[in-house]
C-alpha cells in the first residue's frame, strides 16, 4: 500500500503546472526604451534582484541582452547582481566586465542609454563600480 501511495503522490506532483512552481515575485512598473520582449525579461530580472535571487536575476538580464544587445539597462541590471550589500560582498571586477560588454568606457556606455533616466541609472552603477572605488 505505501508503494501505491508513493506512486500516487508522484503522479499528482507531476501533474502540477510548471507555472505554479514559478516564484511569486510581485509586479513593478519600470519603463525603459527597450522592445517589449527585452523589457519583459528585464522586469523579471529586477524582480529577482529585489528578492536577492542574484543568479536568476543575472539570467533574466542576460536574456534581455540576448533579445536586445544594445539595451543598456540590461547590463546595468546584470552588474547590480554582483553587489550583495547584505553580506558585504561585491564583485567589482565582474561588474566592470559586464559593463565593458556594453561599451568600453563610461562615456561610450552613456551614449548607449537612450533616455535621461537610463543614463542616470548607468551613472549610478558607474559610481558604484568605478575606478575611484567610491
Predicted regions and their residues:
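Inter-helical turn/loop elements of alpha-helical hairpins
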Residues: 53-59, 78-112, 123-134
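Canonical tetratricopeptide repeat
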Residues: 41, 75, 116-123
